């Protein structure tokens, strides 16, 4: 979780994050749901579906009870399906239930690419598209630092950004 939070640093603006009880959700405007089973080696995100649906069947009614007007953001795997599960379990309208999709993956991509180039991830603009997970795509062709293509910047800085390095970054983003 700490790694996820650090990878999300480019998006933070002084948020208040606490660990508490369901009753602490009273009057919450936005609730981020990260609960779920851990992915074991060899398991796919889809393998987590049955376990996480069971977990959500216990969580979502409590969330609805204490925060019936909140916006829900789902960040549990498989995130796209769990967002739909949350929508159905909550009974909330579609405009109040969102999944993180590849937002965290894009933040990881920016963070890891920034670290590799030795620059702030806040200067890196790079996206991951598609379904969160094994089929997601890192969009290298539009990755920039400021207004400079990352390949050009890497060359100017004397940093490798060849197929091997890109593969390593891709692997780190997917498997973080």
Question: Can you annotate each of these PLM segments?
Answer:
Residues 39-41:
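N-terminal glycine-rich phosphate/adenylate-binding segment common to multiple enzyme folds
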Residues 35-37:
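Conserved NAD(P)H cofactor-binding loop of Rossmann-fold oxidoreductase domains
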Residues 31-33, 74-75:
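Redox-cofactor binding/interface segments in oxidoreductases and associated redox assembly factors
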Residues 1-29, 43:
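Conserved N-terminal Rossmann-fold NAD(P) cofactor-binding segment
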Residues 90-96, 104-176:
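C-terminal substrate-binding/catalytic lobe of Rossmann-fold NAD(P)-dependent dehydrogenases
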Residues 44-110:
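Rossmann-like NAD(P)(H) cofactor-binding subdomain of soluble oxidoreductases
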Residues 4, 31, 56-59:
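Short, well-ordered amphipathic alpha-helical segments that serve as non-catalytic structural scaffolds
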């Amino acid at each position: 979780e700490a790694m996820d939070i650090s990878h999300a640093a480019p998006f933070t603006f002084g948020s208040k994050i606490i660990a508490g009880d369901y009753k602490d959700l009273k009057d919450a405007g936005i609730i981020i749901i990260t609960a779920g089973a851990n992915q074991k080696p060899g398991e796919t995100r889809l393998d987590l579906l049955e376990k996480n649906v069971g977990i959500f069947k216990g969580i979502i009614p409590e969330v609805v009870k204490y925060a019936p007007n909140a916006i829900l953001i789902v960040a549990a795997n498989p995130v796209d399906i769990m967002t739909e599960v949350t929508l159905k379990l909550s009974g909330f309208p579609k405009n109040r239930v969102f999944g993180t999709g590849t937002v965290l993956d894009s933040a990881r991509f920016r963070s890891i690419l920034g670290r590799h180039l030795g620059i702030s991830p806040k200067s890196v603009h790079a996206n991951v598209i598609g379904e969160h997970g094994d089929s997601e795509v890192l969009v290298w062709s539009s990755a920039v630092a400021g207004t400079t293509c990352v390949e050009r910047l890497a060359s100017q800085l004397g940093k490798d950004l060849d197929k091997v390095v890109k593969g390593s970054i891709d692997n780190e983003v997917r498997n973080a």
